[in-house]
From Swiss-Prot:
Keyword annotations from UniProtKB, A to Z: Nucleotide-binding
GO function term, MF aspect, one: nucleotide binding
Entry-linked HAMAP family: YajQ
Organism of derivation: Shewanella oneidensis (strain ATCC 700550 / JCM 31522 / CIP 106686 / LMG 19005 / NCIMB 14063 / MR-1)
Function text: Nucleotide-binding protein.
Protein family membership: Belongs to the YajQ family.
Name of the protein: Nucleotide-binding protein SO_3815
GO cellular component: cytosol
Record-linked Pfam families: DUF520 (PF04461)
Annotated coiled-coil segments of the chain: none
Amino acid sequence: MPSFDIVSEVDEVELRNAVENSRRELSGRFDFRGKDASIDYKDHVVTLTAEDDFQCKQLVDILRTQLSKRNVEPSTMDVDEKSVHSGKTFSLKVRFKQGIETDIAKKIVKMVKDSKIKVQSQIQGDTVRVTGKARDDLQAVMALVRQADLGQPFQFNNFRD
């Protein structure tokens, strides 16, 4: 029986490249000359540090642009609401969504069942496995999940015939 997995993951290498490109752009930007600003990456968390709250927002925009250029979906970013003020610097933490949370996975399963496509879907940890008799049904589910707006991008892997 054909099957595939629906996952949501960020490519670690592309994320690191986007952070490095953001650092390069930061060093060349005129509005950040002579300012204490940095972009640090560690364990799927990017820390943006600047002298002003407005500059932190600019750093988020720089990072978002570089992620787009590296084909990493910016909707995977989870930016803190308020920047943390310590001493003379402000810092923002940007986390990246890895895996599908259970409530979003339940929405996917419900959406697939409501579509009346003849497939079975089941939640397996942070992935959703979809199994069906016909490959066309699986491709219809892929199209359905792609057009749904659930707040994060999805990839389809482990396609088996």
